[in-house]
Amino acid sequence: MTEVEKKISFDGRDIHITIGRFAPQAGGTVMIRSGDTAVLVTATRAAAREGIDFLPLLVDYEERLYAAGRIPGGFLRREGRPPEKATLISRLIDRPLRPLFPGWLRDDIQVVATTLSMDEQVPPDVLAVTGASVAVLLAQIPFNGPMAAVRVGLVGDDFIINPTYSEIEAGDLDLVVAGSPAGVVMVEAGANQLPEQDVIEAIDFGYEAVRDLIRAQQELLTELGIALVQQDPPPRDPTLENFIRERAEAPVKEILARFEKDKNVRDAALDEVKAAIEQAIKELEETDPVRVAAALDAKALSNTFKEVTKTLMRRQVIEGNVRVDGRKLDEVRPISCLVGVLPRRVHGSALFNRGLTQVLSAVTLGTPGDAQELDDLHPDESKRYLHHYNFPPFSVGETRPMRSPGRREIGHGALAERALVPVLPPQDQFPYVIRVVSEVLSSNGSTSMGSVCGSTLSLMDAGVPLTKPVSGAAMGLIKEGDEVRILTDIQGIEDFLGDMDFKVAGTDSGITALQMDMKITGLSLQVVAEAIQQAKPARMHILEKMLETLSQPRQETSPFAPRLVNLKIDPELIGLVIGPGGKTVKGITEETGAKIDIEDSGMITISASDEDKAKRARSIIMGMTRKLSAGDVYVGKVTRIIPIGAFVEFLPGKEGMIHISQLADYRVNKVEDEVSVGDEVIVKVREIDGRGRINLTRLGIHPDEAAAARAAVAS
């Protein structure tokens, strides 16, 4: 292929698209670059496997540490399992890509995005999303694109396209918008309690930039003489399809019209209809065209039955403005909440129920040393808030092997984490590392937003002083032609058979997280805006129910949580606290039973099983790092004796000398006549000489001063 390069500029920030240079055997290849961040994206297609009734699309995002001039850690010095961030970027690429493939496509498709060079200020994720579209188009795969993505930041009052890491950190918004010529396809955002209207304007602003990238891809295809692939869907047997529809439509319509609130009852009724049709096919003659067609296409019954159910469910919503469980379009399912559902050895817990969706959230408070250290290409080095999401098979009444968390679980945990980070207390006010685990015990839609709600309550139960509580709701969409219905608090069947899953989380002040996924090729900005606005009253209703259970964070943490105290020292004194080879800090730990974490800034966090131990360690460190003044009185221990005096350690790591003339108010012939190694003595700082040597005395100490020194040690 001829080598071609395209440049697109946004406010002086260029994106370079290069094709024809790399990976010539891949179906489609593009190198996409901005600054020094370069991502190679390939798309490859293979023939459909027999018996597949879904699109086997596999998207992998990979990072190479050489991209940042680093060698991997570990014994092998080689990249291993992709970090969580790579999994999230894989999902970010997949989500806007998947709905643009024709629904009938069954070919194996693999998209691989590899970051080959990393600019410490330019994120690679949105480049990878746009690059995936170019690669798929070049691979000549049927695709309703082009598609592109940009990031929108908010610094001050100004929106920025593709902000740097520094601008993202300094701003109040981190939003990714992906779109096609038909409209918005995907939105992912974290925000600092931003008003709905500001978020809507940001999406609008971002989509305008997306359109520029779409035009650039169209121009690129024109230059190369490549047209979008038009391919007809495989033929279907109308005889079999009509047989199934004739026997399914009436009973399915009747079942949906019952407005059954229990999904298990509704699903069982639908399964009975499906089983009856299957039995009717089996009872036909072996030579009957319907039975012959069914034998050739084992998935025909399931697929057609799903289409019938989908059509009738959607028609019921469009024509009757009523949902399968009888709710109005903007009605939230019944909500109930409990806090403290687990014993207090669990530092905080809550159970959140919304309809048949039930999430148990549990909080663990840890020490700064429990923070997650990140080893990837991204600038964050550690995380003090961790949110993990588990979705066991029993939550949907199924059986399957339970393995390590999948992409969906990692993604849902990250969404809940993003929703809550903006309301966490600053580290200097609440130094704990916080881990929340959301266990989905029952699922009928919107478990990620159930995790947000349950986790808010569990954090409050744990005594975490959130600045504001967060609630979340999932919005859905039914679109037939020009008719559009937005659904509040969607359940499983509405997610499965609907066109959109739009999760919105936030406080009463604004949005903290968004995630929108589509099943159609694009959505107008007007409908996106309506969905965001319609979510607010739902969120406020849910929040009201939550606060009826627990109105504010508890004043005390669990008695089983570690006790933490903070202390700030001069960074130049860190070496004094640590001591040679860590001797001093180890000694404090052994003496008090406390754990001590020291940051380069001089911030020290002391943790212990009870507060007295932590305070004792703080007292020792405060004593050894405070500036000494002549006249200060301490309790010390004689460490060694020389002919002219005795050395006394009066603070950890601090020694001074009592000259023989300062041991007593009478003549002392030998130091050993007055003190021995190991003796406890009361000393006063006499002077600190020009070389920093501390001279001590036992003379002139008032009884009150001695008593105060002993009391300080006892405390």
Swiss-Prot record:
Keywords: Cytoplasm, Magnesium, Metal-binding, Nucleotidyltransferase, RNA-binding, Transferase. The keyword RNA-binding applies. Its EC number is 2.7.7.8. SUPFAM superfamilies: Eukaryotic type KH-domain (KH-domain type I), Nucleic acid-binding proteins, Ribonuclease PH domain 2-like, Ribosomal protein S5 domain 2-like. Residues 631-699 form the S1 motif domain. It is found in: Cytoplasm. Mg(2+) binds at D495, D501. Its main location: cytoplasm. Disulfide bonds: none annotated. Its cofactor is Mg(2+). Pfam families: KH_1 (PF00013), PNPase (PF03726), RNase_PH (PF01138), RNase_PH_C (PF03725), S1 (PF00575). GO terms for cellular component: cytosol. Gene3D superfamilies: GHMP Kinase, N-terminal domain (3.30.230.70), K Homology domain, type 1 (3.30.1370.10), Nucleic acid-binding proteins (2.40.50.140). It is an enzyme of class 2 (transferase). One of its GO terms (molecular function) is RNA binding. It comes from the Bacteria. GO terms for biological process: mRNA catabolic process; RNA processing. It catalyses: RNA(n+1) + phosphate = RNA(n) + a ribonucleoside 5'-diphosphate. NCBIfam families: polynuc_phos, PRK11824.1. Belongs to the polyribonucleotide nucleotidyltransferase family. Involved in mRNA degradation. Catalyzes the phosphorolysis of single-stranded polyribonucleotides processively in the 3'- to 5'-direction. This is Polyribonucleotide nucleotidyltransferase. It comes from Cyanothece sp. (strain PCC 7425 / ATCC 29141). The lineage of its organism: Bacteria, Bacillati, Cyanobacteriota, Cyanophyceae, Gomontiellales. The gene is pnp.
